[in-house]
Amino acid sequence: MQNVLTQRLTNDEQQKTLKTLIEKNLEIKTMNKFDIENLDLYYGENQALKAINLPIPVRQVTALIGPSGCGKSTLLRCLNRMNDLIEGVKITGKLAMDGEDIYGNVDVADLRIKVGMVFQKPNPFPMSIYENVAYGLRAQGIKDKKHIDEVVERSLRGAALWDEVKDRLKSHAFGLSGGQQQRLCIARTIAMEPDVILMDEPTSALDPIATHKIEELMEELKKNYTIVIVTHSMQQARRISDRTAFFLMGELVEHNDTQVIFSEPSDDRTRGYVNGDFG
């Protein structure tokens, strides 16, 4: 009798644990990393973003698409306050990360560690492969060589680059191919353990083979990071993203699951853009 009761309790505990895990998994899937509400941005008198309302889900790839000058890169730079570096910029509205307004009383340097960025053109530092990845750690005052070695290897593995460079870590980063340099920049970013990785057209300067490797890498990275990517390639947005937001002349026309945006958009402007009628 006691064994039966014990077994029942064990089963009940297992069911309870399973329920908790399912609830947490659902919470991760439905949580937003960013909540953008009524966001306006001005460059002097010119309004570049107009009343943007956009949730960005956690641990998914969100693609920002639209013709040149539509505001997608401007919005991307809002997510880690890179626009602060531009004179005359004015921002109103709310942009919250994990519920905290990032334009409130926050440490901007800390924000930019949590929200890393990979730019259009690979920009490795003029130093060795190893030192590129270790640079941010050293800048934070970390001196433990064993710890730095571990982070460098882990980050290069995370960027799918370790096997290609492990025997030449002391070689200059400029000796890498363009695709390898871009993956090195991704490794440098994830070495700082961010929550979010922003990518501003990260494959536009790369050949198709290097582009494919970056896209494969993004599929792995989203298991641990929230990714927001600006892309001019409709095919790329369709391949890699979970959510897509379409911008036109500073306005967010619509956002939805990527499959919906490309197959059943609700706005004729979106339909025209994804069908190649303009752009």
UniProtKB/Swiss-Prot annotation:
Residues 34-274 form the ABC transporter domain. One of its GO terms (biological process) is phosphate ion transmembrane transport. Keywords: ATP-binding, Cell inner membrane, Cell membrane, Membrane, Nucleotide-binding, Phosphate transport, Translocase, Transport. The keyword Cell membrane applies. It comes from the Bacteria. Its main location: membrane. It is found in: Cell inner membrane. ATP binds at residues 66-73. Gene3D superfamilies: P-loop containing nucleotide triphosphate hydrolases. Part of the ABC transporter complex PstSACB involved in phosphate import. Responsible for energy coupling to the transport system. The complex is composed of two ATP-binding proteins (PstB), two transmembrane proteins (PstC and PstA) and a solute-binding protein (PstS). This is Phosphate import ATP-binding protein PstB 2. It comes from Vibrio vulnificus (strain YJ016). The lineage of its organism: Bacteria, Pseudomonadati, Pseudomonadota, Gammaproteobacteria, Vibrionales.
